[in-house]
């Protein structure tokens, strides 16, 4: 295995028998390996735990750590459980149905290790049909993101997150929709640095919304986003006028997403 860097990878697992191995393989193929890989089973109730044990046995003893939750708490709380146990200076999150470019950790860690004012980074993603040979990437240029941008738009997918282990904030416990965006808004509201690289270092295998998984429920996603703005408003981070304007813009985005899903469904029928 390649040289390791002080990064803990956390993968929340829920009934992911068909995709988990692909995600783990993408971590194993990193040019700079993470210090550890933490698999958190969110009370799947199927053979996911058996697969986790099999994967653990394939690699160096202690490199893959298993966390077995006895109640289903959702991805946000599962990520927190792994985060709290992480030993690395940084924590990277990967969803069980996604994967990474082989140089993701190398390039992201290099930036975070030097940018002491940044507590969270993310990067671009690309949709694939299957895990394949990745395009050669030699560098990733990270740029700071202003708070105004974070409020208007979720800047990157959760599978691109790398955070400082000692960050005080966590994903909102029990939240099952748009918890990643709320987390970023909280951090940005506190004046802490967030940066993004446009380079595609995460691979997804289905559309961001309108397909299998939690994101398929557009209305619940919409309610989650509206709740985010109201919570941030109540905390005094933004004004009432800003909340109203952001909610209006959110509904416009919802209409666009709904139209995209409708067109996609019509295309499949044809």
Give the ranges of each region predicted by the language model.
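Conserved nucleotide-sugar donor-binding catalytic segment
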Residues: 9, 84, 140-220
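Acidic helix N-cap motif at the loop->helix transition within catalytic regions
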Residues: 19-21, 46-55, 99, 103
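Short, acidic, metal-binding catalytic loop of nucleotide-sugar glycosyltransferases
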Residues: 25-34
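A conserved acidic beta->alpha catalytic loop
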Residues: 26, 41-51, 71, 95
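Glycine-rich, basic loop-to-helix element that forms the pyrophosphate-binding segment
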Residues: 69-86
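Short aromatic/hydrophobic "clamp" motif used to bind/position activated sugar donors
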Residues: 91
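Conserved donor NDP-sugar-binding/catalytic core segment of glycosyltransferases
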Residues: 103-135
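Non-catalytic, C-terminal membrane-associated alpha-helical segments of glycosyltransferases
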Residues: 200-201, 210-270
């Amino acid at each position: 295995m390649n040289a390791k860097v002080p990064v803990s990878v956390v993968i929340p697992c829920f009934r992911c028998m068909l995709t988990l191995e692909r995600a783990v393989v993408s971590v194993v193929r990193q040019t700079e390996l993470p210090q550890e890989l933490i698999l958190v089973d969110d009370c799947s109730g199927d053979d996911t735990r058996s697969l986790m044990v099999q994967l653990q046995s394939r690699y160096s003893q202690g490199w893959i750590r298993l966390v077995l939750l006895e109640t289903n708490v959702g991805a946000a709380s599962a990520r927190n459980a792994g985060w709290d146990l992480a030993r690395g200076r940084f924590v990277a999150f990967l969803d069980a149905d996604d994967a990474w470019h082989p140089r993701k950790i190398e390039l992201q860690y290099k930036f975070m290790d030097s940018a002491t004012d940044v507590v969270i980074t993310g990067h671009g993603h690309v949709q694939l049909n299957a895990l394949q040979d990745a395009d050669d990437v030699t560098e990733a240029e990270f740029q700071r993101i202003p708070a105004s941008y974070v409020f208007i738009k979720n800047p990157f997918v959760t599978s691109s997150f790398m955070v400082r282990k000692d960050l005080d904030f966590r994903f909102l416990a029990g939240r099952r929709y748009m918890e990643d965006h709320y987390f970023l808004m909280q951090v940005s509201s506190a004046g802490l640095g967030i940066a993004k690289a446009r380079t595609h270092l995460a691979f997804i295998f289905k559309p961001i919304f309108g397909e299998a998984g939690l994101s398929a429920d557009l209305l619940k996603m919409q309610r989650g986003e509206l709740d985010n703005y109201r919570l941030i408003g109540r905390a005094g981070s933004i004004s009432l006028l800003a909340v109203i304007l952001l909610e209006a813009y959110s509904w416009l985005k919802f209409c666009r997403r709904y139209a995209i899903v409708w067109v996609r469904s019509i295309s499949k029928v044809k």
